[in-house]
Amino acid sequence: MSGSTGGRSFADIITSIRYWVIHSITIPSLFIAGWLFVSTGLAYDVFGSPRPNEYFTESRQGIPLITGRFDSLEQLDEFSRSF
């Protein structure tokens, strides 16, 4: 028989008022923080991904697709020069 760790059971935790007071504040706060992180564009800046209007520029309208197996480094250099 296993010993008790002295912790509260899961049923006791989720039926307590304290649990719901804490989580009724933190869960919506995390959702709002994530929504603001994405909607303000900060996610694009932090992760370095291009914004939706920056995928295709005036000078580069084609898809940067690597087609050759052995000359892939040259193709990558060509794509990076077009930025």
Swiss-Prot record:
GO terms for molecular function: electron transfer activity; heme binding; iron ion binding. With its partner (PsbF) binds heme. PSII binds additional chlorophylls, carotenoids and specific lipids. Its cofactor is heme b. InterPro entries: PSII_cyt_b559_asu (IPR006217), PSII_cyt_b559_asu_sf (IPR037025), PSII_cyt_b559_CS (IPR006216), PSII_cyt_b559_N (IPR013081), PSII_cytb559_asu_lum (IPR013082). This is Cytochrome b559 subunit alpha. The gene is psbE. Its main location: plastid. It is found in: Plastid, Chloroplast thylakoid membrane. It comes from Oenothera berteroana.
